[in-house]
Amino acid sequence: MHRQFLSSRCQNLFFKFKLLLFEVNQMQYVYIFIGGALGALLRYLISFLNTDGGFPIGTLIANLTGAFVMGLLTALTIAFFSNHPTLKKAITTGFLGALTTFSTFQLELIHMFDHQQFITLLLYAVTSYVFGILLCYVGIKLGGGLS
């Protein structure tokens, strides 16, 4: 009985994956890929602002910029992207997904902890979270005013 349940779940997941991969607008994948490549390139260039052992300003800038733009685009979606969902996915999932980097942020916090840089760790974490939420909110409000 348990084996039959798992088999039907696997078939259901496979069907959903097949549906996503082959029956969705396939150009969407190309746009997300291009957006992701551009976001990753910008993220790489911004990372040069980081210094060894110093405050990771490049990661902070990338993440806060991404939070603001994501908020802005959330509000502008209705006005400007309703007829262009593929472009919205290219910008949000592709570009902003590659630009912002939660995993690097976490790794930098662990690095600070390992090097007993507790003040810097606290400052970085609080700044990232508080200003990330604030900038996302400002982006939503600004975008709402523009649409």
Swiss-Prot record:
GO cellular component: plasma membrane
InterPro entries given in the database record: FluC (IPR003691)
Residue numbers binding Na(+): 97, 100
Catalytic activity: fluoride(in) = fluoride(out)
Keyword Transmembrane annotated: yes
Pfam families the UniProt entry points to: CRCB (PF02537)
Chief location category: membrane
Similarity section: Belongs to the fluoride channel Fluc/FEX (TC 1.A.43) family.
Protein name in the entry: Fluoride-specific ion channel FluC 1
Organism encoding this protein: Staphylococcus aureus (strain COL)
